[in-house]
Amino acid sequence: MSGHSKWATTKHKKAVIDAKRGKAFAKLIKNIEVAARTGGGDPAGNPTLYDAIQKAKKTSVPNDNIERARKRGAGEEAGGADWQTIMYEGYGPNGVAVLIECLTDNRNRAAGEVRTAMTRNGGNMADPGSVSYLFTRKGVVTLEKGDQTEDDVLMAVLDAGAEEVTDLGETFEIVSEPTDLVAVRSALQEAGIDYDSAEADFRASVEVPVDADGARKVFKLVDALEESDDVQNVYTNVDLSDEVLAELDD
């Protein structure tokens, strides 16, 4: 299992816990509002909005909240904020690269909170471009295994542009080019295979191995960054070995 997959497994488990928090709901709602504003309020004609709504539903966000966010974004209801996407770059403990994706209506607040979280947790900010080149934008679909085998999933999505299908233990992860994301999730739907989420993600091209102590420090930094309401996603290039994962699970 690659470092990507181990990190994804850890992130997935963490996401299940985070989903119980109102903060996670708020971030999903924000995604819906921005998607509707950018590409229109009809999910049938706006794949990004469709995927944002599906993920929110899978995470048990109430339908009323989802619909209100869609309407605010589409201009059908007042109250939408002027959200801006901002990327910050930096390095965490052990030289781990950190890419921070913010969605904010206050650039100064976002910058301040990100900088504070970084400096208080062994990280430091980096110049634009000095970290982002280590990451590549990818389309990522995750699904519960259920009765499906890896071959079942692979056969369903291979012709749709899927690059790889990875077994993450309790789930499968499908990686593609971002432009093939809609085709991949549509192929799953046509095959009658349910999925949890379909979204663009950043994947590291070069990874940094860390021991258990280093991993805990990186997780602490990521947690601190994600405490900010302005931070939507945090990506790192940390590589976790089987031994480190086992030690972390103890």
From Swiss-Prot:
InterPro entries: Integrase-like_N (IPR017856), TACO1_YebC-like_2nd/3rd_dom (IPR048300), TACO1_YebC_N (IPR049083), Transcrip_reg_TACO1-like (IPR002876), Transcrip_reg_TACO1-like_dom3 (IPR026564), YebC-like (IPR029072). One of its GO terms (cellular component) is cytosol. Pfam families: TACO1_YebC_N, Transcrip_reg. The keyword Transcription applies. It is found in: Cytoplasm. GO terms for molecular function: DNA binding. The keyword Nuclease does not apply. Its main location: cytoplasm. One of its GO terms (biological process) is regulation of DNA-templated transcription. Signal peptide: none annotated. Keywords: Cytoplasm, DNA-binding, Transcription, Transcription regulation. PANTHER family: TRANSCRIPTIONAL REGULATORY PROTEIN YEBC-RELATED, TRANSLATIONAL ACTIVATOR OF CYTOCHROME C OXIDASE 1. Belongs to the TACO1 family. This is Probable transcriptional regulatory protein ROP_68700. It comes from Rhodococcus opacus (strain B4). The lineage of its organism: Bacteria, Bacillati, Actinomycetota, Actinomycetes, Mycobacteriales.
